[in-house]
Amino acid sequence: MDKTINPWRKDFPLLQNDPVMYLDNAATAQRPACVIEAVKAFYEQANANPLRGFYPLSLKATQMYEDARKTVQRFIHAPSERCVIFTRNTTEGLNLVAYSYALHHVKAGDEIVVSIMEHHSNMLPWQMVASQ
């Protein structure tokens, strides 16, 4: 495979020596080396529950967690870091949007458009909202 097709492939260790085209990101996304290194550093230096304690390691984890929220806020140009909500995964995030927002705002006659190729985690919540 021509490595010039996607210059970002080099950032993903799994894709270095494999011509794979990984498209199952709804289930598990591949991580670039910088993310793998950051997660490793967290586990080595600050592995504690953020927002759960007042001991030094928990406070450090909380600060890193809130710093990440601010980084995401700046990256997506959100008006405030309070607009950034972390979820465990895409499924949880989609359920949160579908059941806490859409269920109360989508009205009869509104259309919810999803592709037939969608992962069930993105199809089923919208079907449930539509059936209500």
What are these regions (language model features)?
Residues 1-132:
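Pyridoxal 5′-phosphate
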